[in-house]
Amino acid sequence: MTRTLTIFICVLAFLSCPANAQSGFRIMSYNVENLFDTDDNPDKNDNDFLPSGNHHWTRGRYYHKLQQIAKVISAAGEWNTPALVALCEVENDSVLIHLLNRTPLKQQQYRYCMTHGSDTRGINTALLYQRDQFGYIGHREHSVVFTRKNHKHTRNLLHVW
């Protein structure tokens, strides 16, 4: 009887273990709400986010925001940071380079791709990916076309494969 019970417990324990222990990964979407640098881009309407603009956007406030964004991304992953992070409202490549190289996210070896659309303020979407967990092949952006005449222009979609 003891032997049968022992075998039963062993079989039960064996069946409760997954057959293929695959490691999962996290995906995150984050609207960073106007992640602008402090440099004037004469081709875009980014004047509100200059030191002399309506938001009095200084380097100190900019770098503080980068640190806060890095904290949120790190905390979202619990033990491991998310493998993929979709970002909304990013101004340009510079802010992503600063985010990935001047914050603790530097240790995670993220890479990025982003749209470079025609938004008048220069707001784009981007994807951060950990190259050891995501095999980036390429990306393309798609403009959204509305059929109504009174539509508002929107940002391009980012398609990554």
Regions found by a protein language model. Give the residues of each.
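Bacterial Sec-dependent N-terminal signal peptides
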Residues: 1-23
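N-terminal, active-site-proximal structural segment of metallo-dependent hydrolase catalytic domains
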Residues: 19-109, 113-117, 123
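Active-site regions of metal-assisted phosphoester/phosphodiester hydrolases
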Residues: 10, 21-55, 130-161
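Generic secretory/membrane-interface signal
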Residues: 1, 14, 83, 124-126
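Structured beta-strand-rich core segments of catalytic domains in phosphoester-bond hydrolases
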Residues: 90-161
